[in-house]
Amino acid sequence: SGLPEEEPADACTPDATTLCLQSDKFNIGVTWRDFQNRTGQGRATVLSNQSGDFWFFNAQSNELIVKIINGCGSTGSYWVFWRALSNVEMDLVIRDTATLQTLTYHNPLGYNSNGHLDIDTIFRCDGSGPAAETIDTSVDLPAPGAPQRIERTDPALIGPCAPDGDRSICLQNGRFRVQGTWSDFNGGSGYAHLIKKNEGSGYAWFFNGNNYEMLFKLVDACSYNGNTWVSIAGLT
């Protein structure tokens, strides 16, 4: 009768702790608990229509990246890819605002979960999936040991860091240069397109600027163990 239609009660509304992806179809949040039994909610940042991330303790230190891809034409469901850069306890909760289905990924305290690359989720495109599911990520991905050094470059051969478009970025006030390359199953290869978020972290995409493939961060832990920590989370 001329009155505007009300927004559905369950429509996703983005805020400081809520990430809305796929044109607000999915409502995403994460809660955490650390080793001192402190708890909180992740702080959300939207990166694109299908990608976003969360930080827990410091805005310069991102802890989790998530993306949701419409895979209806391939597997008949929406795909959920996420990775974490923390070993605190966390629950990543994803809710489909259209079907009201809820998918929860649980990471126990002390497990450095690398997350999940899930192409067969409960979010079936025809709405036929179960109402809820909880996945314990520690079952498939126990805490790893010391990271393996892949390659080391003589510091004498490295000059001052200078950004080069999106092929090379500088972090920690120019101390570190970040570059990336990729190769696929068909023999294709190329440079990663890098995006600097802040002095401690950034992202990379390979094929599509809306499809983030990697989160990386550097943490100054010199006062703890004399090192700068390097963490990388891939979504591919």
Residue ranges and their predicted role:
Residues G2-T236:
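Polar/charged low-complexity regulatory segments
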